[in-house]
Amino acid sequence: MTFNVSPEHKAQLLQDRITALNLEGYQNELNLKSAEALGNQEVIDQATANIAVIQSAIAVHEAELADLA
């Protein structure tokens, strides 16, 4: 399904989401550092997985944004 959203609104939404994803990624990097300092492997694994998903999402959003240009 295609929604009726102007290119300007799409671009703003994508840019806002990229910013939010970067902030979320930064928080996960901090969580990873804390977990590494404590030797908490479960949190290390989760933060590492979260970072990979966030990086992928950023790439998808950036590609969509580039397609609008």
Report each predicted region and the residues it spans.
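Short, charge-rich amphipathic interface segments used for partner binding and complex assembly
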Residues: 19-69
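Short, charge/polar-rich alpha-helical segments
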Residues: 1-23
